[in-house]
Amino acid sequence: MKKRTTIRISAFLLCLCCAFFTSCKEDDGKGYVFGYDISSNPGSLDPQYASDRESYLIIGSVFEGLFRIGADGNAEKAMAESYTVSDDGLTYSFKLKQDRYWTDVNGYNKKVTAADFVFGFRRLFLPETRAPKASEYFCIKNSDKINSGEITDLSQLGVTAQGDYSLTIELQYTEPSFAMLLAMPAAMPCNEEYFIKAQGKYGLDAERTASNGPFYVKTWNYDAWSNNNNNLVLRYSDKYNEHDEVTPLGLNFFIEDNHITDFTDGTSQSIVLSGSKAKSYLDKNYIYDEFSTAVYGITMNTSNSIFKSDKLRYALLYATDTAELEMPFGYTVADGAVPPSVKNSLGSYRDVVGSKAVVKPDEIKAYTAYQSACAGIDKADLYSVNIIAVENRDEEIGESVKGILQQWQAKLGMYCSISYISESEYDEKLKNGDYTLALTRLNGSYNCPEAYLNSFTGNVNKYSAMNSDYSKLLEKASQAKDEKEEYELCRQAEKQLISDGRFIPVAYVTEYFISTKNCENIIYDAFTGQVDYRNALYFD
């Protein structure tokens, strides 16, 4: 097997050396090089520009923001030594750690200061950056006006430095999830001097990727035309380790598709699986954490199909009884558009708001609505109704969805089928509105109900956009005075989404982060896909 030969030999020799020098000491689990598979080459390690999960994963190991995601899934202080929030919730004042440095594979060495956060946020909102996550931070004073070009004086942005280690962020409205947002990649610092020297290639190779986190990028090899030795090699940062111990020697990220093979043969020590693929690994030989951070549902195209008819949407909604479905392993019946793992200090969103968004099946209402809808619809259009789904991803839950199609046929006399297509073709059809129904998998990019519900707003508009009332509810939720009000506003929006027949919840997906039993202290964030190895241990 030729794949990754060089890196495997290096790792083997490294392990031999470690074994030789530690043979007389008790194994403390430190100094190991962990392996982990990723499916594609990271698009960019520029935190302000990155948008894919592979990039987020590496950025999470290389950069450190004001906050990070802790083992409990909540935001905890990282670069922030301490902070205060004003009584009105609009001003955040931070004292930064004074012992953090920038480094890279070429030995770059400079202290991280408040100016790096100021520059990072200015880049986030500059129109020319085209940052995909900029709108999520429009709570920051004047950020939206800078992003639109209305304001060109960047000093008016509500992010300012008071000396090297004091930072102030002013908001134009309260944001209950602001600490969580400050842990996301887009909020990472950026050293202006380093960025300028990168000459437009910042974060695109190892030589032009700075690090202020526990690891730096030593090598980054990728050849799109070859399956051999595509990988990123990270090693621990000496400067970071001086003040906060980094227990692994390094991380090897392998870019390939054989995740299960590599996990089984020991090339990687952790893997993320769901459904039947996970079942055989949930035994005493492995340790795992489980998360429910994705939800499947049926989305109706209300912009460019016969499902503009609210009566037809209501017919399918009332004819659907998910309680009667047989679910495959790792899936549970969904009672909303936001999955159970979404939580804040109040607890799980689902536990707090309950299942009030669910519409109870009603065969009489379904049939009445269907007959009324058919009076204004060409039968040829009814016969062409089809659900698009993603091949090699949706087949397991697709078997359960067939049960819904049988319900529609039995209760309404309406026939529908499922077509599995490539993910790229699926995304193109959604973009162009070239579909009637879509089997939709909602994944939130961070731990917040709006991260799911915003999929149906005009801002994101991946799916048919809801009306302005829906968007206003979510806008109010993002500006809520506290988490309780945020949850209540999201509950109202979720109920509107479902009761309007735009989205029929089908199933929550349980995702398993599985590691070999000799691993400890590896933290997985199921929302971003980031893995925190700072304190990871491996015992032979």
Please identify what each model-predicted range represents.
Residues D37-D87, A210:
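N-terminal lobe/hinge region of extracytoplasmic solute-binding protein
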Residues E81-E136, T168, I306:
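Aromatic- and charge-enriched surface segment that lines or borders ligand/interaction sites
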Residues S155, D164-Y165, L171-V246, I255-D257:
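Gly/Pro-rich hinge or "lid" segments in bacterial periplasmic/extracellular proteins
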Residues S226-N229, Q371-R441:
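Ligand/substrate-recognition segments at binding pockets and active sites
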Residues V233-S280:
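Ligand-site clamp/hinge motif
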Residues R235-Y240, I287-A315, A319, P328, ...:
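A bilobed periplasmic-binding-protein/Venus flytrap-type ligand-binding module shared by bacterial periplasmic
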Residues L317-S348, E396-G403, L430-D540:
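Detector for C-terminal structural segments
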Residues Y331-C374, N392-G398:
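Structural transition elements
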